[in-house]
């Protein structure tokens, strides 16, 4: 079995670099808030009316999840970010890159395993 622990994907906002992690907690929060399966993640960027709000929520959630993981792993205290902070660092020049980085973080956070699920696929 390979390493199932999600790894942080780096993103730069302003002068600061942050990690983003898709943990089970983050996936659960996303599915609950948007009432979608995680496989439908790209749908959150399709509606021009909600795209920005969804992007800010996802980015803050994933950055804060990485901050919490770093604290668990190292004890380092790093302040959380909020959606307003994230929104100040997203513009038309970097929005597409940020969306792609979020999707890459999802891919990086998905465990790679050579084993099949013992009870078939789960929802």
Predicted regions and their residues:
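Charged interaction scaffolds used for protein-protein
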Residues: 1-13, 17, 36-49, 71-123
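Short capping micro-motif at the N-terminus of alpha-helices
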Residues: 20-22
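Short, surface-exposed, low-complexity cationic segments
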Residues: 24-41
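Short, hydrophobic/amphipathic alpha-helical patches that form generic packing surfaces
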Residues: 54-65, 100-104
């Amino acid at each position: 079995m390979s390493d199932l622990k999600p790894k942080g994907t780096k993103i730069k906002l302003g002068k600061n670099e942050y990690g983003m992690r898709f943990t089970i907690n983050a996936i659960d929060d996303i599915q609950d808030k948007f009432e979608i399966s995680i496989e439908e993640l790209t749908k959150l960027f399709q509606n021009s009316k909600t795209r920005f709000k969804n992007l800010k929520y996802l980015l803050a959630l994933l950055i804060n999840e990485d901050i919490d993981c770093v604290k668990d792993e190292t004890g380092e205290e790093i302040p959380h970010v909020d959606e307003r902070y994230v929104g100040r660092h997203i513009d038309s020049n970097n929005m597409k890159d940020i969306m792609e980085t979020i999707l890459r973080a999802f891919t990086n956070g998905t465990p790679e395993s050579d084993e099949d699920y013992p009870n078939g696929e789960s929802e």
